[in-house]
Amino acid sequence: MLHVTFFGHANFLLDDGQTKVLIDPFFTGNPVCPIKADAVSADYILVSHGHGDHLGDAIDIAKGTGATIISSFELASYCQRKGVKAHGMAIGGKRDFPFGRVRLTAAVHGSGIIEGDNYLDVGNPCGFLVNMGGKSVYHAGDTGLTRDMELINMCFLKGGRLDLALLPIGDNFGMGPEDALYATKMLHPRMIVPMHYNTFPVIEQDVAAFKRVVTELTDSECHVLAPGDTLTLNGHGR
């Protein structure tokens, strides 16, 4: 069993009852997030790239909880220099952790950090395929549509079906609803949760319309979560 809690934007918490894994913990400055960063606990934090709405509060949370940050090698190294534990990986790489397995997947986006007048390049952006609590979860990060998504079921899950896809639909900075629908068809997940929309005016979308199209044109269940909602994955499935 795996509990998946949405905090708005691309911010999620995975909890199997033993370990808590945060993904892209954007709390401070997130206008739709219902809680503050100091209200969450985590054992691990996955960060898809260095932009402020994804790196977010990762370093502060890691300092407060002792959590280990998992990200690209360059971004993990940046976090280590800030005084926290971090494990660096590269796209295509996978590693087993006490809670399960993490694989870094390709994402088409940027990954820079602005500090004052300085721009820091912190490697490539990524997504994550997480196997945890007997379930498989794909967090796409910020990305445009890419055929690399076809590899999730074909190769990485060895023909098994993906349990849950967390896909951006906001457009402008990544996939919009049309491309997210194509991604859903390629990934063929049991369930999909749209993310990275309606946080700011530039990424406003009609999520109800997106859910209708996914329901009509695929056999994936589309779950629209309000910030603070939790989706529980249980029963059969990889």
UniProtKB/Swiss-Prot annotation:
Molecular-function GO terms, alphabetical: hydrolase activity
InterPro entries: Metallo-B-lactamas, RibonucZ/Hydroxyglut_hydro, UPF0173, UPF0173_UPF0282_UlaG_hydrolase
Domain of life assignment: Bacteria
Coiled-coil blocks: none
Keywords of this entry: Hydrolase
Matches recorded under Pfam families: Lactamase_B_2
Family to which this protein belongs: Belongs to the UPF0173 family.
HAMAP family registered for this protein in UniProt: UPF0173
PANTHER family per the UniProt record, alphabetical: UPF0173 METAL-DEPENDENT HYDROLASE MJ1163, UPF0173 METAL-DEPENDENT HYDROLASE MJ1163-RELATED
Name of the molecule in the record: UPF0173 metal-dependent hydrolase Helmi_16730
Organism: Heliobacterium modesticaldum (strain ATCC 51547 / Ice1)
